């Protein structure tokens, strides 16, 4: 059967659990094994440890380690009695024994260790009996054992008279008792012999041991270490060895002589005392009686001294023998007079025993403490930091207190919730875990030091050393404290309240009054504390940082104080914060920075607007939040499934479906409805995806769209009014300025899809159209916009709205109307039905290639890559109807053709038609390849004044194409065309005049450059100035688009290569530029050469004619001299003799 006493394995414990129904775990088994290792008893039920010696209860091994202090058990006499002696000795029979005296003369003795029946006769044959010996007898004589009883032979008895038998029986009883006593004595001697033998090593160890006092006051032997004992043994052996070599023979000394002569007392003669010839003093010596005190008088003295100490709170010191002393003072705690002893932890020492009070001095301390609140009962909650050293009555303390071994309890601190006695010995670990209850001043400095070291900066790059004097540091710290706070005591609450109630100005005045004196004091007495001086100067600067310019504040408030619009509202708030000066909080300063940021944004946006709508910074992100449609959220207009209720609007919607929608027959398939055609292109619907494939691969393939070419962000994507962008009438871009392209739109049946931003909203078609599928006829997809407006029309006005839309709007719009006309029609309808201004539009896609708007219906779109119009409501769409709107999309067809779109007049700049473009060699369908022929046209017109005049009149912006080549620009400058353009267009078109001025300036800079690379860099740098002029011209023409494209290409090329050029790299385009320059210069290079030849011929002919005319007028006799003079003048003018007219030429001219 399993028991817990023989539980050596875990399975034993589990077997015990099964038999007895207990629930002991492995933790119990581990604690049981730990108890066996340290010699403790483990209580399985209470889960505690019990000491077998002191019977103390402990809950953990840590408590045993910290608090268990009992000694090992002392030896007992029973420990030295063998197991054989522990057995009960046989009790001899004290009845009558008949002893037969043999004839042998040897003395017979009795053996009482043999258990023999009473009637048997015991016989011994030996000389003596040795009691209490378990070894062989020392005598050599054999011991004759008692013969075994013979059952067959009858016992021999001797009949005697009755009285002698009784007397002999009494004598034998006495002898038996005496023998038993001797046996007991022998056993006791044997036990003590074993005890002496076992204690011999222990007693020998005590010869070298010292006596020490334990914590409980008991005196114990403290043995020396093994190395000390070995050292003493060697020393004793050495002394014994020397004694053996020189043995000492004792002798009696009966006479002492000095050098063999007589003693000094015999040889010295007695001298007579000298006579003092002075008058003896008449002063009588006072002999004080020696004070002798008994125990009663000493007790009274201690009581009186204790009363004085406690009442006056004086310090005292009780001194004992040698260096024993106890220091303390009288104090009060909660109105009770107590004795406070000086402990070690108050001096900064953490020791196991905080204070040692000798036994002889403890009674005196107790008597002094008894003169105060000795009989007051104390609880642990009444003791707190600052109570260190308080002497309490051990019998009058209640609560969580540690071990109490003496009549007095000296407070030390708290650990694990218990108050510890300073006289108790604790472990080294507890000394560091204990919260010492030292006094307040010590706590202050301990807290200061701890916090100072804890908050030491972690980014110090050097090793700190003690360079300043500690006393000087304390002095400077006191100066700083008094300068900033000016307290009578740092613990004074009234000073703190008075300081708190000071206003900001009063506090600044109070600190300013003292800070100058403190700075001077530190400069003179502590000049090494330069960091403190910098801090004080900074404090002084902050306190005096006041803004007294109230005049400017009032003037600003007067000028724009009533303006609530931006940026004036930000200026007003910033003005209110700045006037506060140093009274402004950090939050207000942060708000001031935000106001400055808003002002900076305003001026930045204003600057960008001044730049005439540059596309570089154009951003038109779509809102991430879906538009709230109140009509679709009103519970009164929703059915039980949350769908929109058309009501009477459903009946009147037939006017749209009957005339402008085509019914789809699904039985014939959707193939003929897939392509949505318009006069200038087509778009592929996603209606075919209504046939859903359950195969994942096929379905994923049906979700892939067919993208078109992206034209990028151009001026076609934006709309402006007054030079500012009208964002609802622009294409949507991402946060980087790239146009957002449309994705595939999946189809649905019997729905009206609303929402141009965010997630689409699906509205069920009217009940009259239920079960049928409708698609708008070609050219009438804008009817979906009117159908979306019908959702917000009240039911009683639905008839008027549909009639007006059909008879007025649709009748005038017809097929493929322009966006301007559609917006105008929406504005007319919204004027009579204002609720439709907030109507949500279907998604509208922009196709810049075909100049078309696509209004997406419920059948979606397979074709992707279109731009998205941002307009989401009717109010935003109506902006396209404004005449002041500058937008190409304003004239796009809603499913129309670009050639039919009306164009605005170009003002002073004429617009080229199709025929004119063909005459110039330009193809309007591909503008990318039209730069070269127009540039060739410009090159031809450089030295042809009439062609140049015609070119400047029709397409003046072709001059900007000259920046492609430095040679072309220089030729254009030298021909005077730029000067002519500046003067002709100065009054009519200042933009063209400014363009010519910029080209002239670039030509001058190019002429100074020595290499083609530098010349191209100059032209690319000047492209930005030309782009600013081309941003918003008065009209549109082909030359403008070509010039704009050329300038943007050069700017993009410069920006792309800027980083490479800055770091020293060169691009491979330099060689390409040389080839292009040769190619372009070839056109006008031959022309220049021909002009040079013609100029040479004309010059020579003119000189010859002039020379002949002069020769004919001169004297014939001096013709030879005149000829030489002409040659000399030609050499002087041309610096070349071959250019001077020759004599033959003169002669021929004379002959002619």
Swiss-Prot record:
InterPro entries cross-referenced by the UniProt entry = HC-pro (IPR001456), HC_PRO_CPD_dom (IPR031159), HC_PRO_CPD_sf (IPR042308), Pept_S30_P1_potyvir (IPR002540), Potyvirid-P3 (IPR039560)
Report the EC code(s) recorded for this entry: 3.4.21.-, 3.4.22.45
Q: This chain belongs to which protein, by name?
A: P3N-PIPO polyprotein
Query: Where does the motif Involved in virions binding and aphid transmission lie?
Result: 747-749
Keywords attached to this entry = Host cell junction, Host-virus interaction, Hydrolase, Inhibition of host innate immune response by virus, Protease, Serine protease, Suppressor of RNA silencing, Transport, Viral immunoevasion, Viral movement protein
The opening ranks of the lineage are:
Viruses, Riboviria, Orthornavirae, Pisuviricota, Stelpaviricetes
Alphabetical GO CC annotations of the entry are: host cell plasmodesma
Q: Which family does the entry's similarity section mention?
A: Belongs to the potyviridae P3N-PIPO polyprotein family.
Which domain of life does the UniProt lineage start with? Viruses
Gene Ontology MF: a single term: cysteine-type endopeptidase activity
PTM per UniProt?
Potyviral RNA is expressed as two polyproteins which undergo post-translational proteolytic processing. Genome polyprotein is processed by NIa-pro, P1 and HC-pro proteinases resulting in the production of at least ten individual proteins. P3N-PIPO is cleaved by P1 and HC-pro proteinases resulting in the production of three individual proteins. The P1 proteinase and the HC-pro cleave only their respective C-termini autocatalytically.
Mind telling me which residues the site (Cleavage) is annotated on?
437-438, 895-896
Choose any GO biological process term that the UniProt entry carries and state it.
Answer: proteolysis
Source organism per UniProt: Lettuce mosaic virus (strain E)
Motif Involved in interaction with stylet and aphid transmission per UniProt: ranges: 489-492
Catalytic residue list: 345 (for p1 proteinase activity), 354 (for p1 proteinase activity), 388 (for p1 proteinase activity), 781 (for helper component proteinase activity), 854 (for helper component proteinase activity)
Residues forming the Peptidase S30 domain are 292-437
**Per the record, what about its domains?**
The N-terminus of helper component proteinase is involved in interaction with stylets. The central part is involved in interaction with virions and the C-terminus is involved in cell-to cell movement of the virus.
Q: Where is the Peptidase C6 domain?
A: 773-895
């Amino acid at each position: 059967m399993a028991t817990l006493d023989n539980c050596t394995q875990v399975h034993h414990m589990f077997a015990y659990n099964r038999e007895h129904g207990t629930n002991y775990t492995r933790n119990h088994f581990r604690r049981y094994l730990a108890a066996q290792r340290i010699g403790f008893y483990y209580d399985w039920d209470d889960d505690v440890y019990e000491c077998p010696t002191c019977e103390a209860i402990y809950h953990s091994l840590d408590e045993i380690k910290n608090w268990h202090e009992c000694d090992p058990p002392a030896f007992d006499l029973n420990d030295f009695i063998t197991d054989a002696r522990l057995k009960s000795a046989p009790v001899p029979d004290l009845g009558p024994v008949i002893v037969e005296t043999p004839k042998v003369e040897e003395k017979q003795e009795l053996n009482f260790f043999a258990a023999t029946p009473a009637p048997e006769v015991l016989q011994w044959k030996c000389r003596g009996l040795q009691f209490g010996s378990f070894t062989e007898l020392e005598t050599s004589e054999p011991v004759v054992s008692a013969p075994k009883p013979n059952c067959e032979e009858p016992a021999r008895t001797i009949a005697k008279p009755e009285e002698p038998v009784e007397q002999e029986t009494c004598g034998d009883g006495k002898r038996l008792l005496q023998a038993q006593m001797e046996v007991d004595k022998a056993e006791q001697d044997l036990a003590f012999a074993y005890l002496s033998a076992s204690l011999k090593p222990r007693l020998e160890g005590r010869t070298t041991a010292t006596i020490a006092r334990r914590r409980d006051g008991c005196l114990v032997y403290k043995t020396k270490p093994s190395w000390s004992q070995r050292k003493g043994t060697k020393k004793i052996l050495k002394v014994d060895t020397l004694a053996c070599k020189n043995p000492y023979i004792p002798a009696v000394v009966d006479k002492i002589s000095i050098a063999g002569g007589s003693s000094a007392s015999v040889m010295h003669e007695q001298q007579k005392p000298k006579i003092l010839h002075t008058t003896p003093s008449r002063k009588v010596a006072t002999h004080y009686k020696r004070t002798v005190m008994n125990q009663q008088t000493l007790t009274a003295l201690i009581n009186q001294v204790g009363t004085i100490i406690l009442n006056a709170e004086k310090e005292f010191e009780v001194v004992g023998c040698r260096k024993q002393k106890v220091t303390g003072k009288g104090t009060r705690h909660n109105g009770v007079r107590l004795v406070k002893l000086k402990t070690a932890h108050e001096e900064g020492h953490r020791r196991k025993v905080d204070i040692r009070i000798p036994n002889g001095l403890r009674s005196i301390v107790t008597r002094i403490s008894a003169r105060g609140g000795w009989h007051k009962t104390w609880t642990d909650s009444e003791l707190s930091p600052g109570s260190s050293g308080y002497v309490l009555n051990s019998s009058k303390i209640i609560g969580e207190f540690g071990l109490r071994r003496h009549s007095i309890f000296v407070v030390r601190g708290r650990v694990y919730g218990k108050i510890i006695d300073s006289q108790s010995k604790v472990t080294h670990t507890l000394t560091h875990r204990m919260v010492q209850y030292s006094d307040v001043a010590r706590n202050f400095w301990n807290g200061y030091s701890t916090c100072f070291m804890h908050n030491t900066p972690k980014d110090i790059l050097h090793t700190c050393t003690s360079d300043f004097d500690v006393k000087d540091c304390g002095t400077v710290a006191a100066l700083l404290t008094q300068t900033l706070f000016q307290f009578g005591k740092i613990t004074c609450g009234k000073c703190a309240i008075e300081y708190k109630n000071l206003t900001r100005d009063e506090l600044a005045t109070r600190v300013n009054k003292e800070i100058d004196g403190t700075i001077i004091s530190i400069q003179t007495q502590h000049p090494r504390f330069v960091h403190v001086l910098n801090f004080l100067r900074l404090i002084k600067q902050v306190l005096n940082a006041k803004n007294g310019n109230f005049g400017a504040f009032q003037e600003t408030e007067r000028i724009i104080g009533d303006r609530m619009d931006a940026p004036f509202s930000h200026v007003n708030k910033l003005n209110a914060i700045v006037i506060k000066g140093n009274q402004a909080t950090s939050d207000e300063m942060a708000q001031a920075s935000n106001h400055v940021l808003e002002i900076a944004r305003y001026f930045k946006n204003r600057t960008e607007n001044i730049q005439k709508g540059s596309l570089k910074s154009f951003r038109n992100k779509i809102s991430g939040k879906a538009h709230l449609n109140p009509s679709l959220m009103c519970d009164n207009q929703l059915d039980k499934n949350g769908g929109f209720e058309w009501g009477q609007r459903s009946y009147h919607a037939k006017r749209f479906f009957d005339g402008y929608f085509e019914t789809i027959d699904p039985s014939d398939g959707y193939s003929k409805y897939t392509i949505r055609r318009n006069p200038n292109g087509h778009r592929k619907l996603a209606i075919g995806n209504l046939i859903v494939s359950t195969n994942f691969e096929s379905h994923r393939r049906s979700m892939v769209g067919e993208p078109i070419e992206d034209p990028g962000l151009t001026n076609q994507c934006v709309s402006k009014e007054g030079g500012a962008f009208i964002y609802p009438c622009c294409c949507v871009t991402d946060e980087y300025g790239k146009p957002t392209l449309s994705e595939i739109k999946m189809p649905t049946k019997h729905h009206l899809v609303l929402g141009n931003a965010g997630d689409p909203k699906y509205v069920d078609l009217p009940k009259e159209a239920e079960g049928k599928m409708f698609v708008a006829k070609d050219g009438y997809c804008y009817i979906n916009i009117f159908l979306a407006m019908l959702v917000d029309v009240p039911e009683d006005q639905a008839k008027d709205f549909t009639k007006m839309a059909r008879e007025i709007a649709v009748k005038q719009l017809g097929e493929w109307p322009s966006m301007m006309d559609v917006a105008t029609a929406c504005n007319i309808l919204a004027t009579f039905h204002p609720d439709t201004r907030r109507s949500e539009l279907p998604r509208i896609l922009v196709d810049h290639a075909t100049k078309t708007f696509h209004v997406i219906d419920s059948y979606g779109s397979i074709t992707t890559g279109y731009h998205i119009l941002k307009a989401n409501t009717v109010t935003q769409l109506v902006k396209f109807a404004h005449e002041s709107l500058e937008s190409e999309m304003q004239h796009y067809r809603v499913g129309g053709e670009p050639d039919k779109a009306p164009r605005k007049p170009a003002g002073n700049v004429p617009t080229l038609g199709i025929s004119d473009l063909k005459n110039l060699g330009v193809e309007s369908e591909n503008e990318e390849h039209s730069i070269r022929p127009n540039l060739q046209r410009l090159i031809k017109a450089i030295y042809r004044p009439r062609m140049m005049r015609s070119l400047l009149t029709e397409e003046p912006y072709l001059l900007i194409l000259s920046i492609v080549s430095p040679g072309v620009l220089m030729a254009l400058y030298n021909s005077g065309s730029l000067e002519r353009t500046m003067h002709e267009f100065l009054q009519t078109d200042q933009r063209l005049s400014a363009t010519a001025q910029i080209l002239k300036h670039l030509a001058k800079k190019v002429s100074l450059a020595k290499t083609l690379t530098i010349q191209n860099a100059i032209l690319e740098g000047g492209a930005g100035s030309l782009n600013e002029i081309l941003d918003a011209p008065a009209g549109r023409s082909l030359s403008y688009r070509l010039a704009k494209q050329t300038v943007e290409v050069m700017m993009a090329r410069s920006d792309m290569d800027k980083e490479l050029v800055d770091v020293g790299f060169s691009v491979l385009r330099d060689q390409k530029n040389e080839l292009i320059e040769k190619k372009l210069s070839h056109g006008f290079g031959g022309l220049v050469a021909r002009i040079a030849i013609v100029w040479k011929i004309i010059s020579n002919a003119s000189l010859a004619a002039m020379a002949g005319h002069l020769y004919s007028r001169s004297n014939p006799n001096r013709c030879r001299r005149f000829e030489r003079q002409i040659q000399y003048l030609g050499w002087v003018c041309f610096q070349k003799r071959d250019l001077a007219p020759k004599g033959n030429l003169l002669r021929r001219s004379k002959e002619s």
